[in-house]
């Protein structure tokens, strides 16, 4: 039985590697922002120890650690509150061996001015012809996790549907799969692997020709090319290691280290033509399982400067958390001091364990 599961995992990884060599397109980058302020406060270095409702995003294998149903909510804003990022998830154990989860992510910009009709047929500017539209990305994910016969080993899979809308101009549907495993040793070391977009998640776009014509004719000589109708998201691999240390019963320190791998050449700190690797390190200090202080560093990049030299940057993060009787409130601030060119934000999240109602 174990040999069968090992064969499935090896086959999935081989498929991931071989497909990555033929895929060059990027899409669905909103799915890389992350969920759960507790995880963001640790620079997303959570793939090995995630064990709650948010595991549906980070590593579905962690869902098997649920003891009761859980609900999670998150909100954050980017670009001076122009873009809003929201997340809701629900997870439920089926029995002591398996669990399921359902989550929804929305990243959108609302009330964008549509000025394609600003100038009427007579060449006059008429502000009454200006309308509003929204652009939004949605991802609905169903997760399933199960323990394997080997003690401490579990696996999980995600099936996700992606919907992207740009007003009445264009829209797309997409579909993809993720898979993850977790393993905990007898001395409490935890290992995790999360393979995202193992089937090269795709988006198939459709366009409103009349609306696009308005854009193409707005400025002569510009905006003349219709974008490609198909986007592919290359596979990504996240490998993690973590351990929790307990001191004098009341104090704990969780340390976690992750390697984030893309099968493309980027400006990550470790980059080759085959793959690029970006490390992340996270810490969580806890007191009586009630108050938590978190810190992390990730997104290490070799940024190109104006003089063509390279400068190593990273994205620090900080977080606070409070948990009382099944209700957890977490806060994270990412990219402290604007150390990198990445997005930064104040992030708040809420997690409710339904055991408080029993």
State where each predicted segment sits.
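Bacterial N-terminal signal peptides that target proteins for export
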Residues: 1-7
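Generic short N-terminal amphipathic or hydrophobic helices
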Residues: 7-8, 13
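Nuclease and nuclease-like effector domains acting on nucleic acids or nucleotide cofactors
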Residues: 10, 19-20
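N-terminal signal peptide c-region/cleavage motif recognized by signal peptidases
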Residues: 15-17
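Subset of outer-membrane beta-barrel
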Residues: 21-358
């Amino acid at each position: 039985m174990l040999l069968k599961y090992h064969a499935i995992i090896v086959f999935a990884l081989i498929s991931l590697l071989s497909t990555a060599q033929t895929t060059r397109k990027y899409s669905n980058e909103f799915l890389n922002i992350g969920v759960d302020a507790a995880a963001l406060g640790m620079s997303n270095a959570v793939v090995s120890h995630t064990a709650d409702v948010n595991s549906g995003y980070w590593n579905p294998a962690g869902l098997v650690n649920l003891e009761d149903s859980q609900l999670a909510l998150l909100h954050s804003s980017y670009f001076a509150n122009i873009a809003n990022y929201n997340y809701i998830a629900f997870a439920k154990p089926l029995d002591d061996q398996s669990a399921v989860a359902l989550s929804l992510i929305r990243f959108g910009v609302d009330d964008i001015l549509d000025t394609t009709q600003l100038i009427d047929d007579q060449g006059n500017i008429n502000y009454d012809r200006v309308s509003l539209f929204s652009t939004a990305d949605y991802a609905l994910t169903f997760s399933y996790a199960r323990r394997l016969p080997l003690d401490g080993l579990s696996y999980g899979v995600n099936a996700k549907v992606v919907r992207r809308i740009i007003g009445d101009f264009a829209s797309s549907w997409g579909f993809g799969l993720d898979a993850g495993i977790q393993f905990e040793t007898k001395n409490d070391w935890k290992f995790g692997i999360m393979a995202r977009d193992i089937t090269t998640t795709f988006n198939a776009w459709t366009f409103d020709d009349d609306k696009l014509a308005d854009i193409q004719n707005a400025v002569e000589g510009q905006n003349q090319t219709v974008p490609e109708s198909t986007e592919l998201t290359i596979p990504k691999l996240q490998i993690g290691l973590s351990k929790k240390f307990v001191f004098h019963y009341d104090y704990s320190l969780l340390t976690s280290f992750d390697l984030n791998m893309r099968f493309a050449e980027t400006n990550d700190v470790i980059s080759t033509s085959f793959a690029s690797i970006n490390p992340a390190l996270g810490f969580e200090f806890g007191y009586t399982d009630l108050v938590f202080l978190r810190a992390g560093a990730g997104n290490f990049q070799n940024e190109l400067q104006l003089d063509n030299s390279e400068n190593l940057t990273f994205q620090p993060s900080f977080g606070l958390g409070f948990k009382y009787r099944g209700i957890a409130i977490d806060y994270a601030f990412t990219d402290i001091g604007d150390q990198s060119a990445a997005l930064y934000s104040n992030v708040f999240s809420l997690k409710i364990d339904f055991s408080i109602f029993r």
